Amino acid sequence: MALHTVLIILSLLPMLEAQNPEHANFTIGEPITNETLSWLSDKWFFMGAAFRKLEYRQAIQTMQSEFFYLTTNLINDTIELRESQTIGDQCVYNSTHLGFQRENGTFSKYEGGVETFAHLIVLRKHGAFMLAFDLKDEKKRGLSLYAKRPDITPELREVFQKAVTHVGMDESEIIFVDWKKDRCGQQEKKQLELGKETKKDPEEGQA
């Protein structure tokens, strides 16, 4: 996200308008269905963003990479967010819960007693989604991009670049993540391997 983290950005978000970046016209976010929620329940990689708002831009510049897991709860209409962010040579972990409103297609989060919202923009055929920020405010507008793979395809890059220019920003304002600087992925891989070894040991002892 970046998002100073997905968390920080959602905590700052006002009510937003979303667009379909693959078409010329703007539309209000589509309703969130169970199918969409199931699709969102996955591992996501922050790919890049273009922000006019200073807090958001500074957050991206201090972050080398970010990935996170979304786990939806259809009973409570909440989403568990578990986030891993590389800042410098350190890996920072965060977790929280997000709400969502099915009818207007928004995420929500309570922060400091205030509920804030973000419209979801799904790019399903690209395995990606976007969040839009203050599109009507020239000084605060922004777009961020997330995908299911860390390697952005030329087609998805072009879609995002066109979306950025369509909302009145310039391609030069886009900051893409350099996944070669990621540290959290390496740590996660080691933890998974350690977990597998831990499971093997008791079985070997019983053999």
Swiss-Prot record:
The keyword Heme does not apply. SUPFAM superfamilies: Lipocalins. The keyword Glycoprotein applies. Its main location: secreted. GO terms for biological process: acute-phase response; regulation of immune system process. Keywords: Acute phase, Disulfide bond, Glycoprotein, Pyrrolidone carboxylic acid, Secreted, Signal, Transport. It is found in: Secreted. The modification Pyrrolidone carboxylic acid is found at residue 19. InterPro entries: A1A_glycop (IPR001500), Calycin (IPR012674), Lipocln_cytosolic_FA-bd_dom (IPR000566). Disulfide bonds join 91-184. Residues 1-18 form the signal peptide. Glycans are attached at residues 25, 34, 76, 94, 104. GO terms for cellular component: extracellular space. Functions as a transport protein in the blood stream. Binds various ligands in the interior of its beta-barrel domain. Appears to function in modulating the activity of the immune system during the acute-phase reaction. Belongs to the calycin superfamily. Lipocalin family. Contains a beta-barrel that binds various ligands in its interior. This is Alpha-1-acid glycoprotein 1.
